[in-house]
Regions:
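Short, solvent-exposed loop/linker segments at the N-terminal edge
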Residues: 2-11, 93-99, 185-200
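Short, exposed coil/turn segments at beta-strand boundaries within extracellular/luminal domains
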Residues: 69-75, 157-163
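Flexible, low-complexity linkers/stalks enriched in Thr/Pro that connect modular domains
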Residues: 74-87, 164-184
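Short strand-edge motifs at loop-to-beta-strand transitions and within beta-strands
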Residues: 43-50, 131-138
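Short proline/glycine-enriched turn/loop motifs at strand-loop junctions of beta-rich domains
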Residues: 18-25, 106-113
């Protein structure tokens, strides 16, 4: 009989493993309490979802024991780790004249997968493992001027997900630094602007 280590965000998880005797009785012991499992008769056994009580976050020792009709006993031990903590991911609003900008933000889990969604399209980002994530320059298609909704989602190995949203504003219109230019009127029609016409 066998059981692999498990990492999950389900605090009452189903458990499954292998058993080489289709008639053996299988019992799963979690934190010192026995739970009868089902021998499926196909080389696997199952402890149904929600059979276990709610388990606290952290590692739990699991021992599975199979007893055949002759009284022979086999067992295996594994660890089920419960992780219901959400990753923390963030992205700030950004205004830029780059139509295919790089994006970066913070992530508290160096093992989480990070995906950036811009205008409804997903783009895999890089978790740098140092508390930051990055979507490389020129990964995005050329974006039109104006605001774009950006959502960044992090998923940890246990399956917990968290999302943050921000606004990416593209502005490629040059600023009007000069302002309006007023040309004095040639009041006497001589083709020359004199001091009176210039207002000096």
């Amino acid at each position: 009989v066998a059981l692999d280590d498990v990492l999950t965000n389900d605090s009452t998880p189903a458990l499954t493993g292998t058993v080489n005797d289709p008639t053996a009785t299988v019992v799963v012991n979690v934190d010192g309490v026995d739970y009868p499992a089902v021998n499926n008769g196909d080389g696997t056994w199952t402890l149904a979802d929600n059979t276990l009580p709610t388990l606290a976050d952290g590692p739990h020792t699991i021992t599975v024991t199979a007893t055949d009709a002759a009284g022979n006993v086999g067992n295996d031990t594994a660890v089920v780790t419960i992780d219901t903590s959400l990753p923390v991911v963030s992205l700030d609003d950004l205004t830029t004249n780059d139509t295919t900008p790089a994006l970066t933000g913070a992530i508290d889990d160096p093992t989480a997968t990070v995906v950036v969604n811009v205008d409804g399209i997903d783009y895999p980002a890089t978790n740098n493992g140092d508390g930051t994530w990055t979507l490389a320059d020129n990964t995005l298609p050329a974006l039109i001027d104006g605001p774009h909704t950006v959502a960044v989602t992090a998923t940890d190995p246990a399956g917990n997900t968290a999302t943050d949203t921000a606004t990416l504003t593209i502005d490629t219109v040059p600023a009007d630094l000069i302002g309006a230019i007023t040309i004095p009127e040639d009041l006497n029609g001589d083709g020359i602007l004199n001091a009176d016409e210039l207002g000096t």
